[in-house]
């Protein structure tokens, strides 16, 4: 069997598994966010933090809850990293001395679900920081994204109310009822597949292929690896991330990790359909996501298997930066999944992808990561795209646009348009400033188009809360740590505030009955329109920069 055939089978089994779990997991999440029953552990947490689980919040109060929780999380994680040398389970290594700028960058990175890492995990973060700091944020940052998505769905589903639910209840339920149970099962499977789970610091001795002994730090890897993928976080315990055999030992654990990356994102549209009382609407959103996912993955595999470039042509495969235990096709599927979501984990070196393969990873992030996108953020991003699509369709036929019985008035379209202006503004401004500063240009390992691609990739990844990188960029500097930290913060919280404002505006409306002129939003035509609007918006925004970077490199 050729590697191409094996890769296609790998992808087909993955898609089939996602289809199988779409309805049961989506229905389960629907019940989690709509039930009135609280678990005993949840009631205890509510008492400890002083929350009335039956009270609801306006969009402003919900947004303040998100911002307050995230701000406290950033401060806690920032301090934890700086004092880790005085805590148990720290690394006895000079490299563990975090600079304030790196601690800031890392704290913002994990709280915003980005997991950009300007450091080597196994030599910088002690086990206590990994567990009590980074792993905890992997859970709660994903739960924040799901909570915001559910709040927007409630905005569509509710009529003439200013309330969107309770952020603290949604946060706790998402963590305890969805992320934690799946993570427990996934961690056991990873350990069974060979991932490590221990508290060793520097005494994990392995034998290399050459027969010599090598000491590699151990740690609680499997428990962090599973939520890293499930919560679309992406930060690796090791610098090599999911290419490291202690994190991702075999081809089937590689498949499992890709499945974990995609499973919640592709199941949330079912939750959306159930909550608005029309499952067909959920299928339409899932179809847009699936179409873009398959299109992107197909192009990624094509570009990687075409042997484009001098070295791939000479050796017969684009194997630079690729683990032999995975191969080119499986690594291509992983690269597409990790950049179509907000994960950013890698099982190969993205800087070593073919020029056009690297362009696909950037384009995936520039789509807004909506196919299926980050945990929660993918759904609310796609719903904002649906709002823009019905607005465009309404202009074409001269009718006031409507979506799910809600009129898309000037306020709603301004909020939706602002949502999609935030990220390009951050990406293009940050890239332009970095390229204008000689000191920051010196951080590029390559000149010419690929050097530009490294910087563009960094700001694209940070602003879209992805966290992957073209590793040729030396990003652990005062300027990059600060600038990318700001890009991550603004790229996360400005869109969230705009989404919640949109949800509040929609929730206050009544319901407009369908008429003969209402655009059907559950049919294939609408699926095609949303996909088309997504591609056009991205192409008009980023094509000039892509032409100067990866496209120019590919033509050369």
Swiss-Prot record:
InterPro entries: KdpA (IPR004623)
GO MF term set: P-type potassium transmembrane transporter activity; potassium ion binding
Keywords: Cell membrane, Ion transport, Membrane, Potassium, Potassium transport, Transmembrane, Transmembrane helix, Transport
Top-level lineage group: Bacteria
UniProt signal peptide: none
Bilayer-spanning residue ranges: 6-26, 65-85, 133-153, 176-196, 249-269, 283-303, 378-398, 419-439, 483-503, 526-546
GO cellular component term, pick one: plasma membrane
Family affiliation: Belongs to the KdpA family.
Function: Part of the high-affinity ATP-driven potassium transport (or Kdp) system, which catalyzes the hydrolysis of ATP coupled with the electrogenic transport of potassium into the cytoplasm. This subunit binds the extracellular potassium ions and delivers the ions to the membrane domain of KdpB through an intramembrane tunnel.
Name by which UniProt lists this protein: Potassium-transporting ATPase potassium-binding subunit
Organism for this UniProt entry: Mycobacterium avium (strain 104)
Gene encoding the protein: kdpA
């Amino acid at each position: 069997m050729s590697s191409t055939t094996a890769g296609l089978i790998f992808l087909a089994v993955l898609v089939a598994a996602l289809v199988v779990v779409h309805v049961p997991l989506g229905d389960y999440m629907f019940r989690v966010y709509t039930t009135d029953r609280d678990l005993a552990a949840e009631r205890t947490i509510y008492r400890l933090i002083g929350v009335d689980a039956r009270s609801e919040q306006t969009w402003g109060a919900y947004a303040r809850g998100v911002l307050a929780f995230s701000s406290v999380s950033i401060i806690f994680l920032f301090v934890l990293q700086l004092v880790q040398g005085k805590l148990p389970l720290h690394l006895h290594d000079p490299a563990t001395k975090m600079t304030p700028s790196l601690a800031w960058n890392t704290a913002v990175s994990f709280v915003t679900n980005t997991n950009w890492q300007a450091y080597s995990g196994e030599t910088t973060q002690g086990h206590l920081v990994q567990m009590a700091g980074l792993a905890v944020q992997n859970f709660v940052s994903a739960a924040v994204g799901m909570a915001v998505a559910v709040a927007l769905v409630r905005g569509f589903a509710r009529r003439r109310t200013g309330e969107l639910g309770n952020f603290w209840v949604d946060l706790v339920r998402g963590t305890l009822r969805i992320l934690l149970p799946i993570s427990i099962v996934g961690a056991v499977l990873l350990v069974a597949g060979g991932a490590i789970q221990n508290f060793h610091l520097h005494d994990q001795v392995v034998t290399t292929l050459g027969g010599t002994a090598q000491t590699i730090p151990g740690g609680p890897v499997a428990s962090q690896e599973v939520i890293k993928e499930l919560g679309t976080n992406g930060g690796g315990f090791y610098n090599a991330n999911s290419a490291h055999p202690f994190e991702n030992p075999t081809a089937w654990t590689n498949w499992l990790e890709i499945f974990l990356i995609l499973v919640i994102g592709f199941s949330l549209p079912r939750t959306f359909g159930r909550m608005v009382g029309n499952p067909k609407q959920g299928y339409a959103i899932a179809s847009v996501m699936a179409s873009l996912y398959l299109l992107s993955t197909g192009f990624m595999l094509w570009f990687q298997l075409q042997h484009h470039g001098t070295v791939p042509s000479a050796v017969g495969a684009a194997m630079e930066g690729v683990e032999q235990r995975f191969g080119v096709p499986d690594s291509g599927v992983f690269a597409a999944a990790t950049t179509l979501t907000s994960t950013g984990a890698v099982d190969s070196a993205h800087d070593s992808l073919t020029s056009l393969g690297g362009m696909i990873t950037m384009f995936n992030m520039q789509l807004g990561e909506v196919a299926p996108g980050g945990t929660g953020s993918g759904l609310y991003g796609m719903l904002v795209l649906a709002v823009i699509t019905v607005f465009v369709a309404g202009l074409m036929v001269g009718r006031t646009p409507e979506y799910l019985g809600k009129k898309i008035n000037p306020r709603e379209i301004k909020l939706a348009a602002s949502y999609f202006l935030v990220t390009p503004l951050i990406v293009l401004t940050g890239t332009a400033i970095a390229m204008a500063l000689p000191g920051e240009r010196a951080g590029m390992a390559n000149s010419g188009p690929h050097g530009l691609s490294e910087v563009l990739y960094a700001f694209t990844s940070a602003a879209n809360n992805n966290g992957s990188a073209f590793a040729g960029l030396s990003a652990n500097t005062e300027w990059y740590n600060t600038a990318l930290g700001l890009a991550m913060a603004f790229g996360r919280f400005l869109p969230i505030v705009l989404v919640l404002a949109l949800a509040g505006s929609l929730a206050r409306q009544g319901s407009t009955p369908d008429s003969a002129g209402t655009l059907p939003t559950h049919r294939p035509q609408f699926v095609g329109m949303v996909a088309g609007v997504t591609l056009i918006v991205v192409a008009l925004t980023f094509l000039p920069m892509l032409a100067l970077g990866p496209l120019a490199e590919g033509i050369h």
